[in-house]
Amino acid sequence: MTAHASIATPGGISLATGRDVRLASRSGALTGSTAGFAPGFVQANLAILPAKLAFDFLRFCQRNPKPCPVIGVSEPGDPTLSSIGLDLDIRTDVPGYCVYKDGVLVDEPADLKAYWREDLVTFAIGCSLSFEEALMAADIPLRHVEKGVKVPMFRTNIACVPAGPFAGPMVVSMRPMTPANAIRAVQITSRFPSVHGAPIHIGLPEAIGIKDLSKPDYGDAVEILEGEIPVFWACGVTPQSVISAAKIEYALAHGPGMMLCTDLKNSALATG
Amino acid sequence: MTAHASIATPGGISLATGRDVRLASRSGALTGSTAGFAPGFVQANLAILPAKLAFDFLRFCQRNPKPCPVIGVSEPGDPTLSSIGLDLDIRTDVPGYCVYKDGVLVDEPADLKAYWREDLVTFAIGCSLSFEEALMAADIPLRHVEKGVKVPMFRTNIACVPAGPFAGPMVVSMRPMTPANAIRAVQITSRFPSVHGAPIHIGLPEAIGIKDLSKPDYGDAVEILEGEIPVFWACGVTPQSVISAAKIEYALAHGPGMMLCTDLKNSALATG
């Protein structure tokens, strides 16, 4: 992933580890996407919600583990999350954030200092960057990475199992592959249930309500070549989509592509 | 597992499926252990807690997935759990229950009709019977099954990651195996992260605070033969032990060995 070689960072700053990226985000040195940085370290989606909704949301995640694989949950009001990052401060350690009120995006601040509340709970949710690293290590090409664009994502007709106010369709990401690579990708990603796990669908987009693969709902379209089939994974955009649809009075999230870089290693997530 | 062939059930009653066992429990026809019944179906540990503690407990489980693999969570006050069992009624569908007040066992009723409250949340937690079935299918002998006794369980010096009032040591189960079978057992149980997953320790009991394998804290001792090593899995007794230690004002659970039999198939839990 070389798409972000152009991101301006002060000369000599290291972005080799999750903590490096967090500190660079905290200092303001890193303001864009985290893709390609902290190789080997788990990057996570963020959902930050009032404590009164925390059990509903965690129950939603338990019921929908493929789109919503939880890798860390904070204590209510506590901006640290030491189980996944040394001296992590969730208010500053991501390059940028989104602030939602009643489901509407109202601000995209560089930090959450003005938006933090004593009743907030942070959920860190696994992200496909972890399994993409394992796929690339197995020499499975990923077209969106090769082209330097965002992975194409689609809303499906697969309903998530609801919990409290949280409900809605599963969002999936799509990667075109040769059949042989698709089979190998099933094997590899099955070892990573805490970062979306095995594909949820393969080969027949219309069967999950996707009419046109050239028109993704999020991200960028990629070409499907002769002899390739589309492979679909549950996507971490699902919880964001569900939180927005629920018109939660107050919710915070990471900015697009600006993930929380943790101290966990992708390799440590493999179950077998 | 033939240990329960002697359990008295009315002539002709089938205990072949999870629902069969639930209905037999509901009617009072089945009053003992569920081991050996509903082969192929997931059996679960139960923890039933007041809603005000539900987020703390679910967060505890998220932080300790090996001893506390959650397979279902109810809506507050709702005695059904349709995601894991058709027309399941948690108040009646287990052969027997335990009632704890302030951490003390105060009753062992046959049903929860007199103990149900509108603020209770049910947690169904995976159980080693699921992975034991996979081990036996691979011709790996399990001594406690051969001997018709309970698996030996030990408190360790491994601290669970706390959440709210829930804290305490991990409890493990032990199965002696030849080294070749131990390796195969790691492979097989790694595929089942939602029912405790891979072993948490192998070979050196003193390293996890176990002084004497002949004196389990729960269950029955089993012999370790020449050429065998002890293999340890995180155990679903851990959440019970933690709930009891937290002296929760009101908590319900299944009776020993009397599990909630679900409609889920063990084979469906495999991640790869």
Swiss-Prot record, chains A, B:
Parts of the chain that traverse the membrane: none
One Pfam short name: D-Glu_cyclase
Entry EC number(s): 4.2.1.-
Key words, A-Z: Lyase
Top-level class of the enzyme under EC nomenclature: lyase
UniProt GO MF annotations: lyase activity
Family: Belongs to the D-glutamate cyclase family.
Protein name per Swiss-Prot or TrEMBL: Putative hydro-lyase AZC_4080
Organism per entry: Azorhizobium caulinodans (strain ATCC 43989 / DSM 5975 / JCM 20966 / LMG 6465 / NBRC 14845 / NCIMB 13405 / ORS 571)
